[in-house]
Amino acid sequence: MSKVFDAKVLAVYMVAPNTYYMEFDAPDIARLAVPGQFVHVRCGETNDPLLRRPISIHMVSRPKGVLALLFRVVGKGTEILSQQKPGDRVNMMGPLGRGFTLPLPGSKVAVAAGGIGAAPLVFLVQELANIKCQVTVYLGARDKRSILCDGQFIQMEAEVVIATDDGSLGFKGTVPELMKRHMDWRKTAMTYVCGPGIMMKEISTMLAEADVPGEVSLEERMGCGVGACLSCAVKISHHGQISNKRACFEGPVFPSWQVVWE
Ligand SMILES: Cc1cc2nc3c(=O)[nH]c(=O)nc-3n(C[C@H](O)[C@H](O)[C@H](O)COP(=O)(O)OP(=O)(O)OC[C@H]3O[C@@H](n4cnc5c(N)ncnc54)[C@H](O)[C@@H]3O)c2cc1C
Ligand code: FES
């Protein structure tokens, strides 16, 4: 069950341009959370911004009761959040949403991360490593300074293959292009994707063509975060029937072949 509470900030670091890693004392979330879920964070003490902001659970340490977030500053809410200092308290609600489905232990899986989309995938790879999966991470960003979490993935013994738009590190091009060249689709039990919409759409199309399963984590604009306001509706196709699902409640993770990409 999700809760609302004030979490004490334990640490804040800027890890890349405009990108912050933040640790909180949050034992209930650390205990309950599964990869792919998110917290809904109140950014600041005043009513501006009024709405909470959804941020994925980046990592948890269950024994220490610690929750970590990794976020990019894009507007007012994330700007205020990035200014919090150790000892400050941040009101949050969570864990929320439906997370990733784990494969059978020992499976060979692919993880595709674009930009800040790497954030929730670190927690996922942590759990995949616990069940001894063989993980290849296809990790992309604009340039080498913007590559995130490569060290964490390597530490968890995942194979990491990098793509940058400008070719300053690894393959020059996009993550889907890299996967087309590198990935052995027939041997991959499951592919997990989080990143820009265009990247998730391209990879979902490739997965459908290769007839292999995948899951994507959708980043929709959210109001309430708990299924009440319908502001996060996404079109999902199930047995040919298209219906609206709430990204905050039935998602944010959906099977890649069910998403109706706009
Ligand atoms: C399930 C989920 C998980 C997310 N996880 C992360 C993460 O781990 N790290 C990270 O950097 N970002 C993440 N985001 C995106 C993050 O929520 C937005 O960047 C943030 O809400 C922007 O708020 P702002 O006040 O800084 O920007 P503003 O542009 O001022 O925000 C205005 C409004 O738009 C909403 N909004 C703006 N951009 C987005 C967006 N991309 N997705 C959803 N709502 C948006 C805000 O919640 C707010 O209501 C996630 C989004 C979702 C839906
Ligand atoms: S954000 Fe309100 S229903 Fe999803």
Curated annotation (Swiss-Prot):
Chain sites annotated for binding [2Fe-2S] cluster: C224, C229, C232, C248
Primary location class: cytoplasm
InterPro entries for the chain: Cbr1-like_FAD-bd_dom, Cyt_c3_hydrogenase_gsu, Dihydroorotate_DH_ele_sf, Dihydroorotate_DH_Fe-S-bd, Dihydroorotate_DHASE_ETsu, FAD-bd_FR_type, FNR_nucleotide-bd, OxRdtase_FAD/NAD-bd
Biological pathway: Pyrimidine metabolism; UMP biosynthesis via de novo pathway; orotate from (S)-dihydroorotate (NAD(+) route): step 1/1
Gene Ontology terms: biological process: 'de novo' UMP biosynthetic process
CDD domains in the record: DHOD_e_trans (cd06218)
Protein name: Dihydroorotate dehydrogenase B (NAD(+)), electron transfer subunit
Origin species: Desulforamulus reducens (strain ATCC BAA-1160 / DSM 100696 / MI-1)
Gene behind this protein: pyrK
